[in-house]
Amino acid sequence: MKYVHVGVNVVSLEKSINFYEKVFGVKAVKVKTDYAKFLLETPGLNFTLNVADEVKGNQVNHFGFQVDSLEEVLKHKKRLEKEGFFAREEMDTTCCYAVQDKFWITDPDGNEWEFFYTKSNSEVQKQDSSSCCVTPPSDITTNSCC
């Protein structure tokens, strides 16, 4: 396998292209009036944006990048905050039976992205204070998109 493919519906192609170019750090390789495609070599990801008249609810829980260290988490957080995104930080949190350092950003259509580093395994699924990949979109009041 070369690429994992993910396609998401978006309302505004222009806003979404702008958001994902900043998040991924690459330009879209194909742009049409109702479609855009990004190819990331590391990780191998074929990510497409598909224009829809309306995007209701969150059809996926979230997306994320697992990185190798806390330093890498902080590097991406700093980079995206410089681009004007709001980053919701969760350090030393228990989520998905693991202790993690992470932050979250939200795309123009409400899809959440996490950048996380797994520090160790845990016997519990989540801490009460952690959003742990299950925050309903209606609970999110700040859109990180500029």
Curated annotation (Swiss-Prot):
To M.tuberculosis Rv2641. InterPro entries: Cadmium-induced_rsp, Glyas_Bleomycin-R_OHBP_Dase, Glyas_Fos-R_dOase_dom, VOC, YqcK/CadI-like. Its EC number is 1.13.11.-. Roxarsone (III) binds at residues 95-96. This is Probable trivalent organoarsenical cleaving enzyme. Its cofactor is Fe(2+). Pfam families: Glyoxalase. Keywords: Detoxification, Dioxygenase, Iron, Metal-binding, Oxidoreductase. PANTHER family: CADMIUM-INDUCED PROTEIN CADI. It comes from Bacillus subtilis (strain 168). It catalyses: methylarsonous acid + AH2 + O2 = arsenite + methanol + A + H(+); roxarsone (III) + AH2 + O2 = 4-hydroxy-3-nitrocyclohexa-2,5-dien-1-one + arsenite + A + H(+); nitarsone (III) + AH2 + O2 = 4-nitrocyclohexa-2,5-dien-1-one + arsenite + A + H(+); 4-aminophenylarsonous acid + AH2 + O2 = 4-aminocyclohexa-2,5-dien-1-one + arsenite + A. Residues 2-118 form the VOC domain. The lineage of its organism: Bacteria, Bacillati, Bacillota, Bacilli, Bacillales. Nonheme iron-dependent dioxygenase that can break carbon-arsenic bonds, playing a role in the detoxification of environmental organoarsenical compounds. Catalyzes the oxygen-dependent demethylation of highly toxic methylarsonous acid (MAs(III)) to arsenite, which can then be exported out of the cell. Can also cleave the C-As bond in several trivalent aromatic arsenicals, including roxarsone (III), nitarsone (III) and (4-aminophenyl)arsonous acid. SUPFAM superfamilies: Glyoxalase/Bleomycin resistance protein/Dihydroxybiphenyl dioxygenase. Organoarsenicals are used as herbicides, pesticides, antimicrobial growth promoters, and chemical warfare agents. Arsenic is the most widespread environmental toxin and is classified as a Group 1 human carcinogen. One of its GO terms (biological process) is response to cadmium ion. The gene is yqcK. The thiolates of the vicinal cysteine pair (Cys95-Cys96) directly coordinate the arsenic atom of the organoarsenical substrate. Fe(2+) binds at residues 5, 62, 114. It is an enzyme of class 1 (oxidoreductase).
